[in-house]
Amino acid sequence: MSAQSLLHSVFSCSSPASSSAASAKGFSKRKLRQTRSLDPALIGGCGSDEAGAEGSARGATAGRLYSPSLPAESLGPRLASSSRGPPPRATRLPPPGPLCSSFSTPSTPQEKSPSGSFHFDYEVPLGRGGLKKSMAWDLPSVLAGPASSRSASSILCSSGGGPNGIFASPRRWLQQRKFQSPPDSRGHPYVVWKSEGDFTWNSMSGRSVRLRSVPIQSLSELERARLQEVAFYQLQQDCDLSCQITIPKDGQKRKKSLRKKLDSLGKEKNKDKEFIPQAFGMPLSQVIANDRAYKLKQDLQRDEQKDASDFVASLLPFGNKRQNKELSSSNSSLSSTSETPNESTSPNTPEPAPRARRRGAMSVDSITDLDDNQSRLLEALQLSLPAEAQSKKEKARDKKLSLNPIYRQVPRLVDSCCQHLEKHGLQTVGIFRVGSSKKRVRQLREEFDRGIDVSLEEEHSVHDVAALLKEFLRDMPDPLLTRELYTAFINTLLLEPEEQLGTLQLLIYLLPPCNCDTLHRLLQFLSIVARHADDNISKDGQEVTGNKMTSLNLATIFGPNLLHKQKSSDKEFSVQSSARAEESTAIIAVVQKMIENYEALFMVPPDLQNEVLISLLETDPDVVDYLLRRKASQSSSPDMLQSEVSFSVGGRHSSTDSNKASSGDISPYDNNSPVLSERSLLAMQEDAAPGGSEKLYRVPGQFMLVGHLSSSKSRESSPGPRLGKDLSEEPFDIWGTWHSTLKSGSKDPGMTGSSGDIFESSSLRAGPCSLSQGNLSPNWPRWQGSPAELDSDTQGARRTQAAAPATEGRAHPAVSRACSTPHVQVAGKAERPTARSEQYLTLSGAHDLSESELDVAGLQSRATPQCQRPHGSGRDDKRPPPPYPGPGKPAAAAAWIQGPPEGVETPTDQGGQAAEREQQVTQKKLSSANSLPAGEQDSPRLGDAGWLDWQRERWQIWELLSTDNPDALPETLV
């Protein structure tokens, strides 16, 4: 089925078998007028009578129109000529009636009609939805004919009905085009980062981020998955372990050992045991999932009871009133008031449960819109993903990995035992060696297997808890260090001593997240026990007896439980007993080294992080941009950095605790991880702020800021600490361009700024200027002059964010936003909300720099007095700088407030010199205290000598800008 035959069937173009060419041409024109997304050039050339041999011969190539090997420019003329020729009559096409009728309906993105958004696969010319695919490729070919010089991007962007047109570019085609065409920084929504040689990443905007060692728990789920691949590659290339290394699989089904088979047979015989084991003898990931599910069930029951009691308490006042009012009424009214509390207190009715808690049945893909109280539900759903993927035999690549740090995957039993022993057993001599009560240990095991929330108190024996922990590790189907890496861990002893620790670190990176987190918790506990092995003196001067459990003794006990091979039979074990003894010695040495160096083993050095980012940059550059910006924002705030370190090293260990210290944001990928902390809302609002093609974020103080690549010259920039201001008040600061007007003499280290102050165009000079979001007054200024002076391109204040070499000679125009009324005299006036005034913010990118600069420059020339206009390429020295606040410039601000500069007449008569006053007022608004906080703007400086003059000028401004003045602009033009 050729593409040209589709055009014939759809548009009913003229053919040799048609009755008359004129009628067919008119019919095709009438049909094309009903389509809102086709180029008008089609109407004139659709019914021309030319030879159809060439068109039919080349119509078969329409399916390969935008293939990567054929440029659009070379295909344009050929396909244009083929579109004008009448195609041969198709014999296998369906009737053209339904297709033509579908063109008359309005096209929307949800519709599947040919005139709507085309959902097609460009690699397959025919197949499912083949009509839409062929036609979607044919129509751009016709459009490419008249203008063969246009590129594919211009064709897709031109002559279409906006987002609902037929030229909505498919995602996969754009991904291929991204690698074919040279990168355009303005076209990509994410910043392009480049890796330097010293683990430093530089962005297109000039920001530089240096990587540092971080705990492995602080990495996102996607980073940890890529870290496995990077570690696997380095082990194969750099480490000679003389064995085959494979990445362990999470949740694999293992063959049952003889002991497990006997245990399962015994459980089948004992039918009185109605519970399914929840902890012992199960894969580690399943144990964690069971813990999460049980914790979720408990929380839901507790919340339902709380909601039911709250519901009853809320209804009791109404019930009491109605009962007191209707004591003499019928029994039916009394019964109706008593039925509601009885129904609400019933635990079986789900009505008291709020709507949000009944959202557990939703798909995992849409769990990002749950609130903060659903973090445990998120974790339970996320933990159930590996089991579901394994049961459905899905590929690991198909799983959606989060860009946020996942919570600690440590079983509740392991964490409870470690906490109990750290609290009560550090001074117990011979811990893990002294025998325990088998009966009490069996009882504790059954309680954990039933899923009961066991609370280990002081009355529980330390030796019983220690035996329970060893039994849990011994009964795991797969050891904690996995059987795939058994030989690799042992062969690390064959390496040089300086290489052993690095190889162990890479092998730990290969472990699944649940094994890695549990191993970290266990090694941390064993390290604490080993530190209390020797006798020491307490703070009170008393001698404290050590537990005598050194790292070697602990490795001797836990080594065979952490790393062992599967024993198929007792006979095989007896034959290989001598070899097992040698391997046991090696296992003990490996575990001892891990206990002594556990802190360094779970830190990710910068070189591995750099490899992970390079690996991600090849496939997902937007993810690299997201991760690097988050690293910069984390390091910029010390409190977030401390909380991240405390989360990674200590604090929450159990799988029942939420990852409240997670600092990830809403990622470009679907996010399955727990709900993040409240601090991440700041960065999320920065993501949502419309700032052009490149989003600029907070840069930490310790990171070096280099000059912007697009600037003609490099200047200093010193970002200050971020103010603790909520970004919900103003998502961006539009007055950052003020800093380009600062001179070298006004430098002051007291500048404070926010994320929106660093623009791509302006390298900021340090000054005592406060750039928080709170410095914008709630009202816009009312511009003086007639409405004709403000053309359509300059409504209010225009924000430009790019810089060109043309702006080198002169500073940015002083666009200010001042308070139109002093707060002292605005008591009875209705203030316009800030949201309304924000409608007049016009954001211009780098491509409209010249137009916006001309507009604002013209506005400045009209509003500035003649003596203060810039001459040539420089600024007149008589023009004083705007009065920036700060401890370093009170004298300059006071001097500018007390008197105007030379050459400017001070208006005294309001009626006689109205024009000059208007110019001065507008100039003052352009260069006045726009960067002053609202408190400093409106508070009169009683200590200044010119306070009365300043107050009089403020009143004149207010009177001039009031609504009673006919010269003021209308409300809608401000």
Curated annotation (Swiss-Prot):
Matches recorded under Gene3D superfamilies: Rho GTPase activation protein (1.10.555.10)
Recorded GO cellular component terms are:
actin cytoskeleton; actin filament; cytoplasm; cytosol; mitotic spindle
- Sequence positions bearing Phosphoserine: 37, 264, 363, 667, 673, 680, 711, 754, 772, 777, 786, 820, 928, 931, 939
Q: Where is the composition biased (Pro residues)?
A: 85-98
Record GO biological process: actin filament organization; actin filament polymerization; focal adhesion assembly; negative regulation of focal adhesion assembly; negative regulation of stress fiber assembly; positive regulation of intracellular signal transduction; positive regulation of phospholipase C/protein kinase C signal transduction; regulation of small GTPase mediated signal transduction
Report domain Rho-GAP positions. 401-602
The alphabetized UniProt keywords are: Cytoplasm, GTPase activation, Phosphoprotein, SH3-binding
Indicate whether Amino-acid biosynthesis appears among the record's keywords: no
Q: Where is this region: Disordered?
A: 1-120, 322-361, 639-672, 709-729, 742-838, 860-945
Q: Which SUPFAM superfamilies match?
A: GTPase activation domain, GAP
User: Which SMART domains does the UniProt entry name for this protein?
Assistant: RhoGAP (SM00324)
Q: What tissue specificity is annotated for this entry?
A: Highly expressed in kidney, heart and skeletal muscle followed by retina, lymphoblast, placenta, lung, brain, pancreas and liver.
Domain of life, source organism:
Eukaryota
Write one Pfam family the protein is assigned to. Answer: RhoGAP
Q: Where in the cell is it found?
A: Cytoplasm
InterPro entries, per the entry: ARHGAP6_RhoGAP (IPR041852), Rho_GTPase_activation_prot (IPR008936), RHOGAP6/36 (IPR037863), RhoGAP_dom (IPR000198)
Q: Chief localization class?
A: cytoplasm
The site (Arginine finger) lies at 433
* Motif SH3-binding: positions: 342-352
Role this protein plays? GTPase activator for the Rho-type GTPases by converting them to an inactive GDP-bound state. Could regulate the interactions of signaling molecules with the actin cytoskeleton. Promotes continuous elongation of cytoplasmic processes during cell motility and simultaneous retraction of the cell body changing the cell morphology.
Tell me more from the record: ARHGAP6 gene undergoes X inactivation.
Q: What is this protein called?
A: Rho GTPase-activating protein 6
Organism of provenance:
Homo sapiens
